[in-house]
UniProtKB/Swiss-Prot annotation:
It comes from Mannheimia succiniciproducens (strain KCTC 0769BP / MBEL55E). The lineage of its organism: Bacteria, Pseudomonadati, Pseudomonadota, Gammaproteobacteria, Pasteurellales. Keywords: Cytoplasm, Methyltransferase, rRNA processing, S-adenosyl-L-methionine, Transferase. This is Ribosomal RNA small subunit methyltransferase C. GO terms for molecular function: 16S rRNA (guanine(1207)-N(2))-methyltransferase activity; nucleic acid binding. It is found in: Cytoplasm.
């Protein structure tokens, strides 16, 4: 199965013939495998570990914040996060030779129309197709942009975080300020947490870092699927002189061992749609990753049907804190 964006690209396969091709951005389907026989080589640069985990062994894939490879043709799948797009495209073009050919594809609702404005200063760009509610643009590089990783780092502090300084890169959830859901969840974190703690879907590492700050004996593991989140969490730990393990995992896919506390502000947005797969997987499998008597604690929008899921898999739940928009739920394994 291929996405709407890839269906549009399929109409232009002669542009791929006998070329080395790099697919980047929000690519998340089987299109790379479909075009392998027509291209000299196909490689993927993805920031999303759930996709990387799914296609590993089928396609050459690079899961990293920084990518230094080159290709005759770059195919960029536009994402809804404009800062993320700018980070990736500027990095790719700074590393590319003058004359580099780029195809940019995206759903209209994701904001792909802004591609022309973003790239006009660096070369020739024009729309070559419009179908499936998507726009396809062809770009030729004439002037390489400047790209400095350090310019993209953001930091912030918050009264609720004490001395903690949060470091984040574009595309990371709550990258510029402490979100209200995490704030409510942290209000339930005291200095009595011991043992092994898993911060699942860690973003910039705020929750796990605060637990470590308040509970130095706790052994904290942080996971996420997003490469930028993992890099941000690692730096947040490092700059605050805190210890912890940071690893890529699609929910529990690469998590080993059992935990005294699994804590999360789980994502419920997938691209530009709302999705519950990860949350259902988190709740349905958490029991197998908790020690006897271990706790799963999550914060969620009050309108989401998580209480039903928690009751289904744990036989009940407690509400530790709530506002008119958010609730913190707790269940014991």
């Amino acid at each position: 199965m291929i996405s709407l964006e890839s269906q549009v690209l399929e109409r232009h396969l002669p542009l791929f013939a006998d070329k080395s091709v790099l697919l980047a951005g929000g690519v998340n389907d089987d299109f790379p495998q479909k075009i392998q026989s027509q291209c000299r080589s196909v490689k993927i640069w993805s920031w999303y570990f759930d996709y990387v985990n799914q296609i590993q062994g089928k396609s050459a894939v690079d899961f990293s914040v920084i990518f230094t490879g080159r290709a005759d043709l770059i195919v960029y799948y536009w994402t809804k996060n404009k800062q993320e797009v700018q980070f990736q495209l500027m990095q790719l073009l700074a590393n590319a030779p003058v004359g580099q050919e780029v195809l940019i594809i995206g759903e209209n609702r994701s904001g792909v129309r802004s591609a022309e404005k973003m790239l006009a200063h660096f070369g020739d760009i024009g729309k070559i197709d419009s179908a499936r509610r998507c726009g396809l643009y062809h770009f030729t590089l004439q002037k390489q942009p400047n790209f400095e990783l350090e310019n993209f780092w953001k930091t912030y502090r918050s009264p609720q975080l004490g001395e903690l300084i949060v470091y984040s890169l574009p595309g990371v959830f709550s990258a510029n300020e402490l979100d209200v859901g995490t704030q409510l969840l942290l209000s339930t974190v005291k200095d009595n947490i011991r043992g092994d703690v898993l911060d699942l879907g860690c973003g910039a590492g705020v929750i796990g870092s605060m637990i470590k700050l308040k509970n130095p004996p706790a052994k904290v593991t942080m996971t996420d699927i997003h490469a930028m989140a993992l890099a941000s969490a690692e730096r947040t730990l490092l700059e605050n002189k805190l210890s912890g393990q940071v690893l890529a995992s699609d929910v529990f896919s690469h998590v080993e061992g059992k935990f005294d506390l699994i804590i999360s502000n789980p994502p419920f947005h997938d691209g530009i749609d709302t999705a519950y797969r990860a949350v259902r997987e988190l709740i349905s499998n958490a029991k197998w990753h908790l020690v006897p008597g271990g706790e799963l604690r999550i914060v969620a929008n009050a309108f989401l049907p998580y209480p039903d899921l928690l009751d289904e898999y744990f036989g009940g739940h407690k509400v530790l804190a709530q506002t008119n928009k958010f609730k913190v739920y707790s269940v014991i394994g």
